[in-house]
Structure formats: structure tokens, C-alpha cells
């Protein structure tokens, strides 16, 4: 007598179920990825603005701590083309020494000229209430803090503009260094609508 063959049931997904699941995942990725990337690029740009504010703040504190004028030097990086280096020149020799604090800005958020920023004049009129402003050049500049931590000369507000060269959707950021040494960070979109972040 022959034993009846038992039908073994297969465990798992059918090909149709797998294709439907992959299709749903691809649709979710297509919708979510651009939103995620836009938020990620905006975050990178805001982080670069915070780094600029931090190195300016640190340079100011170095001037107060050492009780002497200290420069924050801004120049294109010699080692990394397309990047900008900012550092607190505590010893005043104009050379970036290994012991001096520095930041390196890249494509995710780098300094740009005032002319490439939309509605920069609207930002200045809103934020400065008639004070004169200076935009240090991304291709080379210094910001001097005196021994009390005030900007020298104390008549202008220094405005640093940042943009993300990878994504224009990230907008722009502006770091405003006031004559007394306080710092404001402003955020602007691609059309030039500005609002204060900090």
C-alpha cells in the first residue's frame, strides 16, 4: 500500500506580494526623499552658520582672555580647493598654527559675496536699524576684536553670508557680528524672505 503524499505548504511571500511591497516602498521613497534631502541641506547650512558664529565668539573670548587684540582670519583653504578656513589667530602671526582653533567650510555651507544673496538690503534694513554694515570677503579678510572683545573698528556690523552650493533650496544664512561683539543668525529663502533664528 502506498503512503499518501502530504502536500507541504510553502511559507513566505508570493511574487505578487513582493512586487506590491516593493512598489509601495518605491513610492514612499519617491515622495519622501526630496523632502528629506531639502531638510538635510538646510540643516547643513544652518550648521555652517553656527560654526561661523562659534569661531567668531571663540576669537572674541580669546581677545578677552589674552587681554590683547586678536584677529579672526578668513581665507580660502590651500589644502582643500573650494573650501574656506576661518581661525582665531591668537598669536597674531597671520599663519594658521596647529594649536589655534579653526573651522573649515565646504559645499554644504560656505561664505558667499553679498551680491549673490537675494534681498540682502532688506535683511540689513530690518536687522540693523540704520547701522552701517561691512561684508568681509570670502576670498580673504580679517575681523579684529580688541582686548575688551568689541569689534574694531566699532562703527560697522560685519555680515557673513552663507549658501549651500549643492542645493539652492536650502536658502541662505547670514551671521551678523554687532560692534559690541554680540552675534545674530538670520535665515533666508531663495526669494529673499529673511527671519531671525538666534
Q: Can you annotate each of these PLM segments?
A:
Residues 2-7, 13-16, 22, 27, ...:
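N-terminal helix-rich module
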Amino acid at each position: 500500500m502506498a503512503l499518501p503524499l502530504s502536500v507541504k505548504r510553502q511559507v513566505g511571500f508570493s511574487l505578487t506580494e513582493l512586487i506590491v511591497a516593493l512598489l509601495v516602498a518605491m513610492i514612499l521613497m519617491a515622495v519622501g526623499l526630496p523632502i528629506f534631502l531639502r531638510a538635510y541641506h538646510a540643516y547643513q547650512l544652518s550648521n555652517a552658520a553656527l560654526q561661523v558664529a562659534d569661531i567668531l565668539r571663540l576669537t572674541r573670548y580669546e581677545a578677552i582672555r589674552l587681554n590683547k587684540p586678536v584677529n579672526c582670519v578668513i581665507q580660502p583653504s590651500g589644502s582643500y580647493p573650494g573650501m574656506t578656513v576661518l581661525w582665531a589667530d591668537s598669536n597674531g602671526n597671520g599663519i594658521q598654527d596647529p594649536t589655534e582653533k579653526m573651522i573649515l567650510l565646504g559645499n554644504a555651507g560656505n561664505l558667499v559675496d553679498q551680491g549673490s544673496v537675494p534681498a540682502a538690503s532688506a535683511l540689513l534694513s530690518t536687522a540693523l536699524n540704520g547701522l552701517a554694515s561691512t561684508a568681509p570677503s570670502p576670498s580673504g579678510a580679517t575681523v579684529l576684536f580688541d582686548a575688551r572683545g568689541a569689534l574694531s573698528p566699532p562703527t560697522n556690523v560685519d555680515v557673513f553670508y552663507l549658501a549651500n552650493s549643492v542645493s539652492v533650496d536650502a536658502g541662505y544664512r547670514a551671521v551678523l557680528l554687532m560692534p559690541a561683539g554680540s552675534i545674530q543668525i538670520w535665515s533666508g529663502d531663495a526669494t529673499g524672505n529673511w527671519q531671525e533664528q538666534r
